[in-house]
Amino acid sequence: MKAPAVPDWSAKLARTGWWHSMELPGESIEGVRSVAEMRESLARFPVPEDLRGMRVLDIGAWDGWFTFEMERRGARATAVDCWDNPRFRYARERLGSGAEYVVADVYELSPERLGRFDLVLFFGVLYHLKHPLLALERVCALATEAVFVESWVTGGKPGGRPAMEFYEAGELGGQTDNWTGPNTACLLAFCRGAGFARVELRAVKDSRAHAACYRRWPPPEAGAGPAPELLKVAHNTGGGLNFSSRRDEYVSCWFRPAGAGLSRENVQPEVGGFGSRPLYVGRKEGGAWQANFKLPPGLTPGWHEVRVRAGGSAASNALRIAVDLAAEPGDLAIAGLADGVAWTPGALSGDVLALWVRGLPENADCANVRVRLAGRELAVEYIAPPGDEARQVNARLPGPVPPGGYEVTVAAGRAEAAAMVSVCRS
């Protein structure tokens, strides 16, 4: 498919050397984009005039007009680009700017490297990327409130079918650094899929789409309905409460709402205050509902509260999950063991072994607790929640074990405990 025609800026860029026009002390620089055009583009987003006390990140800063405008409004501004632009450094010096300048690829960006920002500008970058969705996930992780995205689009209606063109060798405007051309629906879907709670199309003009992407749900309206009861939260595939921010992981939660008629459009889960759009919402037996959603990008290591709102309700009670937490047990000890069906103390006659273990870490789950019998790994199927001094752990044998006495070990992190069990039959 032939890409839509794009203006040829090459002659003007070659003549001026600047992409952004600049008003510097005692000097006006004419770039490809006029100051009026950039002000018009920025005005399509709800950027406050007063940004004092806020950190703002400008990704794809180029010559820096948007960076310096954020600083002019009072923000602590940081600019990022994939190459060291001498024109940015020149303008920063002339303006006496204190903006930080970071040369890095968008895929290298992380909260650990840059910190977190109230607002992120992501203008004119997406179509230069081979992996636009991955980039949006990286950008989402950096923002605590909002990311404003401006990108080339191939057209299409916002509610149409998402589609994207791939430009292998300069098909878009003759530039070999233009790789992708999403249509408007695809751009919005990318933003939602990257982990933003809300995505709002602000404008489409001259094949440029402007999307405001928010990390949080709006606050409940006055007179919001009764809060649902959050029953359980677990890893979508592992079933435990431990999650890794370095992976593309998903959360399942079960809740009991006060009303009915729920869908993906009116269920609002959140983790650590960051909203995440449900990928699945369905009713289960007994009046409970289940929602599956992406773990929000950029969570700090530690415990995070999960809540859910449903059908315009207030927020539910909170349950906690662990993100990037190592299992750090106390002094592990096996306080008792028994057959998991017959409950014969000290003996195993079936396929399930029940143990009572002291010293397990609070974030112990089936993924980070290991049980072995005679050196063979058992499948951990259940761990009792924290509360009792000794927590029950159920593990299933992988196959037949001859009668006799065997050593059983339980390990969490670098700690391990052992006991003996008598296998009567298998």
Please give the residue ranges for each predicted region:
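S-adenosyl-L-methionine-dependent methyltransferase catalytic module, highlighting the catalytic core
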Residues: V106-P111, F117, L121-F122, K130-P220
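Conserved class I S-adenosyl-L-methionine
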Residues: M54-W62
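Conserved alpha-helix/loop element of class I SAM-dependent methyltransferases that forms part
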Residues: V32-R52
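Immunoglobulin-like IPT/TIG beta-sandwich domains and homologous Ig-like subdomains
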Residues: N242-A318, A347-M420, C424-R425
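Class I SAM-dependent methyltransferase SAM/SAH-binding core
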Residues: W65-E108
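N-terminal, positively charged/glycine-rich alpha-helical extensions of SAM-dependent methyltransferases
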Residues: M1-G26
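Short, compositionally biased P/S/T/A/G/V-rich stretches that sit at domain boundaries
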Residues: E221-S244, L325-G346
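A glycine-biased structural micro-motif
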Residues: G53, G115-R116
